[in-house]
Amino acid sequence: MSAVETSKKSEVVAQFARAANDTGSPEVQVALLTTRINELTVHFKAHTKDHHSRRGLLRMVSRRRKLLDYLKGKDADRYRALIEKLGLRK
């Protein structure tokens, strides 16, 4: 399992940051988790029996869900904008 490349990570941070040098806002954290989740999803199509990494994937999905719940309670407009931008819900 490889982490998100540094250049790709900085692109995601720049795209979802609310201010300069913003790496901790829920939007940035959710976006980074989403990129890692998408990469792992591709990995599991080829390696169906990799249960150890699947546990890590489930932890990431759970953490993303918690961050989204926090953002939804804090600011519903930001939540909806993030969901739409990432394409997470239908």
UniProtKB/Swiss-Prot annotation:
One of the GO BP terms on file: translation
Example GO molecular function: rRNA binding
Keyword annotations of the record: Ribonucleoprotein, Ribosomal protein, RNA-binding, rRNA-binding
Disulfide bonds listed in the record: none
A GO cellular-component term linked to this record: cytosolic small ribosomal subunit
Function: One of the primary rRNA binding proteins, it binds directly to 16S rRNA where it helps nucleate assembly of the platform of the 30S subunit by binding and bridging several RNA helices of the 16S rRNA. Forms an intersubunit bridge (bridge B4) with the 23S rRNA of the 50S subunit in the ribosome.
Protein name: Small ribosomal subunit protein uS15
Organism from which the protein derives: Paraburkholderia xenovorans (strain LB400)
Classification lineage: Bacteria, Pseudomonadati, Pseudomonadota, Betaproteobacteria, Burkholderiales
Gene that specifies this protein: rpsO
